[in-house]
Amino acid sequence: MGWMKLYQPQAVDVSSLRGRLNLTQEQFAARFGFSVATLRHWERGDRSPSGASLVLLNVIDRNPAAVLQALQ
């Protein structure tokens, strides 16, 4: 059996992403299912998104409309 390549999502600048979408922290958190507190920690650099959250942020970064449509 061969080795599988492990997907490593890229780091996302959450504050910049939110700014490009022209959303407040509260709006971004509500639309994409994050808590405002978690979003604030990411933006301050206290914590870094990981796992499924990081994957979701990468998808939002590439195609926010598709994520919003899927979440409706």
Model-predicted segments: where are they?
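N-terminal positioning helix adjacent to the helix-turn-helix/winged-helix DNA-binding module
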Residues: Q10-D13, A52
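N-terminal flexible/basic segments that precede or flank functional cores
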Residues: M1-A11, A66-Q72
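Short basic helix-loop element that most often maps to the first helix and adjoining turn
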Residues: V14-Q27
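Residue-level detection of the helix-turn-helix DNA-binding "recognition helix"
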Residues: G19, G33, R44
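DNA major-groove recognition helix of helix-turn-helix/homeodomain DNA-binding modules
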Residues: A52-L71
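Short glycine/proline-centered loop/turn elements that form peptide/ligand docking sites
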Residues: V14, G33, T38
